[in-house]
């Protein structure tokens, strides 16, 4: 029987499995719950992975007792070597018919492997933010990703927090706002359904919900699209912070990544990128300044991309490559370029 190759996208909320034939065709897919082993524990993680792969095998008309040739898992927390080793041991021990070979990588590595063959940057701006560089040799480095207490600069949470902070500081006469706060202040009271600043404290402390708080970013985006100067200013600063994340990893980039026809590939993940036009000015400013300060002349262009397929596809590709097989991939279908720039 022809070999099958599997890939897993392991999300904190939802997960996906894809099964591919030797010629790179997607034969079956299956969705499931979170497979973040930090959140649910190793036991439940491996059980969910096995259950999803079994369902996908059945959809593909394959006997679940026939193991895959390889299974590449793109998981959050996939850089922790001890945890990865434990996961693979558990998968082999408890589910010997699941797969012959395993590779566990980070969610960033799976994402970039879906979009490009050689690596690049994954720049995440959703509820939180993170920047990961994956070089052609598979080595990784990064900037950010430490959560809202330590940063998450340029994320939805950060944008919401900046907006609230500017309003509070302006009313307190602690720091003058760069623009009139009227629109943002009213949007803040409306979103959190409170009459004054004291009401906001409940949402900041006793009933703090990071996702709910970050959701205020959407109202700032609406204000920016309506032309509110303060809302536009906050998004411009967010773009600058995201650009600075890229600048931070420039010294670690293999020069090969600058030389492709796309220039430096930057894969953009997360809902804040829907507001690219609002981020653009600050993003370009940060990259232009950073490039000049580091004298990075080889960094002459970049392309921003979004995924059209699950990072399980990249996971499958990396898993196959790990055992010496190159799955055919059509990268032009897997990701779409939405902005290119040459310095």
Swiss-Prot record:
Name of the coding gene: Nagk
UniProt keyword Transmembrane helix, yes or no: no
Annotated EC: 2.7.1.59, 2.7.1.-, 2.7.1.60
Lineage: Eukaryota, Metazoa, Chordata, Craniata, Vertebrata
CDD domains assigned to the protein according to its UniProt record, in alphabetical order: ASKHA_NBD_NAGK_meta
Keyword Phosphoprotein listed: yes
Catalytic activity: N-acetyl-D-glucosamine + ATP = N-acetyl-D-glucosamine 6-phosphate + ADP + H(+); aldehydo-N-acetyl-D-mannosamine + ATP = aldehydo-N-acetyl-D-mannosamine 6-phosphate + ADP + H(+); N-acetyl-D-muramoyl-L-alanyl-D-isoglutamine + ATP = 6-O-phospho-N-acetyl-D-muramoyl-L-alanyl-D-isoglutamine + ADP + H(+)
Major enzyme class: transferase
Protein family per UniProt: Belongs to the eukaryotic-type N-acetylglucosamine kinase family.
Protein name per Swiss-Prot or TrEMBL: N-acetyl-D-glucosamine kinase
Positions of post-translational N-acetylalanine modification: 2
Any Pfam family the entry gives: BcrAD_BadFG
Phenotype of gene-disrupted mutants: No visible phenotype in absence of infection. Macrophages are completely deficient in muramyl dipeptide (MDP) sensing.
Phosphotyrosine sites (modified residues): 205
Residues annotated with Phosphoserine modification: 76
Annotated positions binding ATP: 13, 127, 214, 271, 275
GO terms for MF: ATP binding; muramyl dipeptide kinase activity; N-acetylglucosamine kinase activity; N-acylmannosamine kinase activity
Biological process (GO), any one: UDP-N-acetylglucosamine biosynthetic process
Subunit structure: Homodimer.
């Amino acid at each position: 029987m022809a070999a099958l190759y599997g890939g897993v996208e392991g999300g904190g909320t939802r997960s996906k499995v894809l099964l591919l034939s030797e010629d790179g065709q997607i034969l079956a897919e299956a969705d499931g719950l979170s497979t973040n082993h930090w959140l649910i524990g190793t036991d439940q993680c491996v059980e969910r992975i096995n259950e999803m792969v079994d369902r996908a095998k059945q959809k593909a008309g394959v006997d679940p007792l026939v193991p895959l040739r390889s299974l590449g898992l793109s998981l959050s927390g996939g850089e922790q070597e001890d945890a990865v080793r434990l996961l693979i041991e558990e998968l082999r021990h408890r589910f010997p018919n699941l797969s012959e070979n395993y590779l566990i990588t980070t969610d960033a590595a799976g994402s970039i492997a879906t979009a490009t063959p050689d690596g690049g940057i994954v720049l995440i701006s959703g509820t939180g933010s993170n920047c990961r560089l994956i070089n052609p040799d598979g080595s990784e480095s990064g900037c950010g990703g430490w959560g809202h207490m330590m940063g998450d600069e340029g994320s939805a949470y950060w944008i919401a927090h900046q907006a609230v902070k500017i309003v509070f500081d302006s009313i307190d006469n602690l720091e003058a706002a760069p623009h009139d706060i009227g629109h943002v202040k009213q949007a803040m009271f409306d979103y959190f359904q409170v009459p004054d600043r004291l009401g906001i404290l409940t949402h900041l402390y006793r009933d703090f919900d990071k996702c709910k708080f970050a959701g205020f970013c959407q109202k700032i985006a609406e204000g920016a699209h309506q032309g509110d100067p303060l809302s536009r200013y906050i998004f411009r600063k967010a773009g600058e912070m995201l650009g600075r994340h890229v600048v931070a990893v420039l010294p670690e980039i293999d020069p090969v990544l600058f030389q492709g026809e796309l220039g430096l590939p930057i894969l953009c993940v997360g809902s804040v990128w829907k507001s690219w036009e609002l981020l653009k000015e600050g993003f370009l400013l940060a990259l232009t300044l950073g490039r000049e300060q580091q004298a990075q002349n080889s960094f002459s262009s970049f392309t921003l991309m979004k995924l059209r397929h699950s990072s399980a596809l990249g996971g499958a590709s990396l898993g196959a490559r790990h055992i010496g097989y190159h799955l055919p991939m059509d990268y032009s279908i897997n990701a779409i370029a939405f902005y290119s720039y040459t310095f």
